[in-house]
């Protein structure tokens, strides 16, 4: 049976209700009572047998005590040698058996942004994917930790349904109606690729190559598929979009304070902690494969505290639950920090060596005191303006080792932060500077003043959390041997998310809970980091010259939102762009003009559906794009609003790799079946598009074009040759196939092929069994050690290397002009913007849910059955009663931007005044032409647009998914009413 011709079982297959004809020998004889079959050997009918059992019961003959003969002496019962073999109507059992019968098994996984990276076995029968099953062969590396096997969730367990689903796109499609109208014409691959190629050649030849962009998220979930389009866009001189900041998954407080994108312990390390606070991380919903470590840690004596606004699915499994008001997590964290500091529960040695707390701050400017400020300091630093100063215990000014002034760039492990003197933590003095005598204080003194604002009365008033409760939690956290915070998206979705991140990080810093197993702040939101970094990077961006763009800013700018922004914020955005701190493409031309973007490729993502400011994206940005190409295995919202849709292979039809920072393994995708219909893998699609572009350019005689920004030429007549060439070895045609690209990543990555070792992980190794990575490369902060779970920050805490910040330490004081101007040089709590979306009484949140990974599985029939089958709005009972709303009513949630109709669900576990809709419902799943993001405006925070230092940016500089403005999903106001104005 061909999988292209049939997607379900034949109608004639047998069932328990309709036995096949070949069971005639088991049928009752003529004259027997209907429905009372007689066993062919014993001559005993089922009714007679049951009557006999009943008599035996009445006579008190227990089956456990009665002899074999006692039943048969009752008459009519005869022994049966093979009762199972002679039982009638048994062919139905073959259906069950056939479920566990297969022709082949392939190892694969799922390319979704969930951080799971779970290995699955995919079973094939008669050319059809029959089912999937979690593999159970992750190798154990520490017998004292819970078994890592198996990993998976209910979404992965029904991906088979997608393989032959009605949503599958089987052929190239061209739009013939309006965008979003759903009118398509089937075209050939040659027609599709030729039309796209001719458009691309036109754009590049006209110098508009930077008007071509590609959006695809999360390389770790399938790096070859990520690289497929990124590689071509890079060769064309086009623009690669960020994604981690766009989804508001990036915690900006981490690059601000620690100078890194993020680094986390693998989830197995949770078991090593004595104390865990799950803060805004609904582990039992969004981290299902890893939840076992959180749950089992309780059996290991770990105390688990939950901080959630609602009584969530994770809160019910914690020992204590704190419920601060929405958007007040920062105030709660600062209150806990104030308790720790005020009661002397901090780790003084850690603060002196590992943080900026002893550094001196000028009281006249708010800037760090630098060696260049003080004539009496004779420094050997190459950049004395970035050589920062401390006071030793005798009151003498000393240079802070590891400062940026003596380092060669952001990351320089040739220096050390180890101290040969005892610095003052709480110091204050007057210093003779180049401009006169200036009073200076330590950062610690400044921090204590800030924390004094967050006394118990203030914190309780702001958060409603009990004073004694949060103070006790703070003490317990500080006094635990190994304490850890697991932070989730619940902290990231707010406008002031950077302040929230910094405040939570402060708790682990104050208590010295960094740099060893069982400690740290683990931030798991999005599968953001890829282990095999170098191989992925050079595969994705072979020229080494990348036009990366922060997607939030790109969207904000081209959707016309900047023109409607408050003047102060708009001025900051323009200043950041003008100074080159944040790029926007297309670039400004010599005459001062800036073209509109013209071309967008989307693959492995659902940009249109997930876009904040969704109304502006549709009305302002989308009309500027002459060509939107979506590469997709299913018809989602972005595909609906595209011009050409190309069918790509499903997750069970291709070669690729999978990894995550939740564990230290790499494992593969392998094709269980051939791609459905005319679909091709992402790598094949972009490879063939490159080939078509080269053909068109050659026919036209298009000459190489000098890149305006980089020292390179864009040569369309060799773009296919360049695409399939191994740029590391120079071998021509080496990367023509997907599997070769997988091998390339593994071969060219330190994590899988260490330079100082004979060990190497090959693709074949991963097919045999998930492989634990051999080393941690340069973009990780600890080594992978045999026999222990990965835990970050050891490079700094144990090895004394400088942190990649201006100070060379964990940096809580940021003396950038914008931070000082906005009063955010230290972590503090601020209210969010007022009346975003309008002056309405309720907050609107869109958290991650249990039944989908972003929009994948949002249209799954099986999973829709678990959640009422349609979009839901969760309301507190009192909010619903106040509006005359009952469970199951159709309601409208609305603000100044849009109104969305959906079903109300009464949710007693939430706080009053909050309306929540789990995010990522597809636009076509709503009755109105809106979606969950239609209600959400787009706005950006100026502190996330800076470069620091302003002139060189070693600490904070735009790099895709490391530093850039985040999207904001919360801080939105709405109201709710019954649909139709309350009329029945």
Curated annotation (Swiss-Prot):
* Broad class of enzyme this protein falls into: oxidoreductase
Q: Which residues form the 4Fe-4S Mo/W bis-MGD-type domain?
A: 103-167
What the record says about temperature is: Optimum temperature is 70 degrees Celsius.
Name what cofactor the protein needs.
[4Fe-4S] cluster; Mo-bis(molybdopterin guanine dinucleotide)
Binding locations of [4Fe-4S] cluster:
110, 114, 118, 153
**Gene Ontology MF annotations:** 4 iron, 4 sulfur cluster binding; metal ion binding; molybdopterin cofactor binding; nitrate reductase (quinone) activity
Q: What does the sequence similarity comment in the record state about its family?
A: Belongs to the prokaryotic molybdopterin-containing oxidoreductase family.
Protein name as it appears in the record: Respiratory nitrate reductase subunit alpha
* InterPro entries xrefs: Asp_de-COase-like_dom_sf, DMSO_Rdtase_II_Mopterin_su, MopB_CT_Nitrate-R-NarG-like, MoPterin_dinucl-bd_dom, Mopterin_OxRdtase, Mopterin_OxRdtase_4Fe-4S_dom, MopterinOxRdtase_cofactor_BS, Prok_molybdopt-oxidoreductase
Query: How the protein sits in the membrane?
Result: Peripheral membrane protein
At which positions is Mo-bis(molybdopterin guanine dinucleotide) bound?
Answer: 249
Subcellular location per the Swiss-Prot or TrEMBL entry: Cell membrane
Principal place of residence: membrane
Quaternary data? Probable multiprotein complex; a catalytic heterodimer of an alpha and beta chain is proposed to associate with additional subunits involved in membrane attachment and electron transfer.
Biological process according to GO: nitrate assimilation
List the source organism.
Haloferax mediterranei (strain ATCC 33500 / DSM 1411 / JCM 8866 / NBRC 14739 / NCIMB 2177 / R-4) (Halobacterium mediterranei)
Q: EC number(s)?
A: 1.7.5.1
Which reactions are catalysed by this chain?
A: nitrate + a quinol = a quinone + nitrite + H2O
Would you tell me the Gene Ontology cellular component terms? plasma membrane
PTM note says: Exported by the Tat system.
């Amino acid at each position: 049976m061909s999988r292209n011709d049939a997607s379900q079982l034949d109608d004639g297959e047998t069932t328990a209700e309709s036995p096949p004809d070949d069971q005639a020998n088991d049928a009752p004889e003529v004259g027997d009572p209907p429905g009372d079959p007689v066993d062919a050997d014993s001559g005993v009918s089922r009714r007679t047998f049951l009557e006999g059992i009943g008599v035996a019961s009445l006579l008190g003959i227990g089956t456990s005590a009665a002899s074999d003969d006692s039943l048969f002496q009752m008459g009519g019962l005869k022994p049966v040698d093979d009762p199972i073999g002679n039982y009638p109507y048994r062919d139905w059992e073959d259906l069950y058996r056939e479920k566990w019968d297969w022709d082949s098994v392939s190892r694969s996984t799922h390319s979704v942004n969930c951080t799971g990276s779970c290995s699955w076995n995919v079973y094939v029968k008669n050319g059809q994917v029959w089912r999937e099953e979690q593999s159970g062969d992750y190798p154990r590396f520490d017998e004292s930790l819970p078994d890592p096997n198996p990993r998976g969730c209910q979404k992965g367990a029904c991906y088979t349904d997608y393989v032959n689903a009605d949503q599958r796109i089987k052929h190239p499609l061209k739009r013939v109606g309006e965008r979003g109208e759903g009118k398509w014409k089937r075209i050939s691959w040659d027609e599709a690729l030729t039309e796209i190629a001719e458009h691309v050649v036109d754009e590049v030849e006209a110098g508009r190559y930077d008007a071509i962009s590609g959006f695809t998220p999360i390389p770790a979930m399938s790096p070859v598929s990520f690289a497929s389009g990124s590689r071509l866009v890079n060769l064309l001189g086009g623009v690669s979009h960020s994604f981690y900041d766009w989804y508001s998954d990036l915690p900006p407080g981490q690059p601000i304070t620690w100078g890194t994108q993020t680094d986390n312990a693998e989830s197995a390390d949770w078991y090593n902690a004595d104390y865990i606070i799950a803060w805004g991380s609904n582990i039992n919903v969004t981290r299902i494969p890893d939840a076992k470590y959180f749950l089992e840690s309780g059996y290991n004596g770990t105390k688990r505290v939950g901080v959630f606004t609602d009584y969530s699915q994770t809160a019910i499994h914690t020992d204590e639950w704190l419920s601060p008001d929405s958007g007040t997590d920062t105030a709660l964290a600062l209150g806990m920090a104030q308790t720790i500091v005020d009661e002397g529960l901090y780790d003084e040695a850690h603060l002196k060596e590992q943080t900026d707390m002893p550094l001196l701050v000028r009281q006249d400017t708010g800037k760090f005191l630098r060696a260049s400020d003080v004539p009496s300091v004779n420094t050997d630093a190459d950049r004395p303006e970035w050589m920062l100063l401390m006071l030793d215990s005798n009151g003498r000014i000393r240079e802070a080792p590891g400062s940026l002034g003596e380092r060669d760039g952001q990351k320089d492990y040739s220096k050390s932060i180890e101290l040969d003197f005892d610095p003052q933590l709480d110091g204050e003095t007057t210093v003779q500077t180049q401009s006169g005598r200036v009073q200076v204080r330590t950062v610690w003194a400044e921090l204590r003043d800030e924390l004094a604002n967050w006394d118990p009365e203030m914190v309780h008033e702001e958060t409603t959390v009990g004073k004694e409760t949060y103070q006790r939690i703070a003490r317990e956290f500080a006094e635990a041997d190994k304490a850890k915070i697991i932070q989730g998206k619940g902290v990231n979705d707010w406008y002031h998310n950077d302040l929230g991140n910094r405040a939570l990080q402060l708790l682990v810093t104050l208590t010295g809970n960094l740099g060893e197993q069982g400690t740290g702040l683990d931030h798991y939101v999005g599968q953001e980091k890829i282990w095999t970094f170098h191989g992925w990077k050079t595969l994705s961006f072979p020229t080494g010259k990348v036009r990366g763009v922060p997607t939030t800013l790109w969207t904000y700018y081209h959707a016309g939102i900047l023109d409607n922004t408050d003047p102060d914020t708009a001025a900051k955005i323009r200043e950041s762009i003008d100074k080159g701190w944040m790029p926007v493409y297309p670039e400004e031309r010599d005459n001062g003009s800036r073209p509109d973007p013209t071309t967008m490729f989307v693959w492995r993502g659902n940009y249109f559906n997930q876009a904040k400011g969704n109304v502006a994206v549709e009305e302002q940005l989308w009309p500027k794009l002459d060509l939107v190409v979506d590469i997709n295995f299913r018809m989602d919202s972005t595909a609906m609003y595209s011009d050409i849709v190309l069918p790509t292979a499903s997750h069970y039809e291709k070669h690729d790799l999978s990894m995550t920072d939740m564990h230290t393994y790499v494992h593969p995708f392998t094709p269980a079946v051939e791609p459905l219909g005319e679909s091709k893998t992402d790598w094949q699609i972009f490879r063939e598009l490159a080939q078509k572009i080269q053909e068109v350019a050659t026919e036209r005689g298009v000459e190489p074009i000098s890149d305006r920004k980089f020292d390179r030429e864009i040569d369309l007549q060799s773009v296919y040759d360049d695409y399939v060439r191994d740029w590391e070895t120079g071998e021509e045609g080496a990367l023509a196939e997907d599997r070769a690209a997988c091998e390339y990543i593994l071969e060219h990555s330190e994590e899988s092929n260490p330079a100082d070792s004979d060990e190497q992980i090959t693709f074949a190794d991963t097919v045999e069994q998930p492989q634990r990575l051999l080393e941690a490369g340069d973009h990780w902060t600890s080594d992978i050690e045999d026999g222990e779970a990965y835990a970050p920050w050891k490079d700094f805490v144990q090895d004394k290397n400088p942190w990649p910040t201006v100070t060379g330490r964990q940096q809580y004081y940021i003396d950038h002009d914008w931070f000082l101007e906005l009063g955010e040089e230290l972590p503090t709590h601020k209210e969010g913007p007022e009346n975003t979306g309008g002056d309405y009484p309720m907050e609107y949140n869109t958290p991650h849910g249990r039944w989908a990974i972003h929009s994948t599985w949002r249209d799954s029939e099986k999973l829709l059955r678990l959640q009422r089958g349609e979009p839901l709005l969760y309301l507190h009972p009192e909010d619903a009663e106040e509006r005359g709303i009952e469970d199951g009513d159709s309601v409208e949630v609305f603000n100044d931007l849009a109104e969305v109709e959906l079903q109300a669900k009464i949710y007693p576990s939430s706080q009053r005044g909050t309306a929540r809709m789990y995010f990522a419902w597809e636009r076509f799943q709503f009755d109105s032409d809106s979606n969950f993001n239609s209600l959400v405006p787009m706005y950006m925070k100026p502190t996330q647009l800076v470069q620091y230092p302003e002139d060189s940016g070693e600490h904070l500089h735009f790099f895709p998914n490391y530093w850039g403005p985040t999207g904001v999903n919360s801080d939105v106001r709405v109201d709710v009413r019954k649909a139709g104005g309350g009329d029945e």
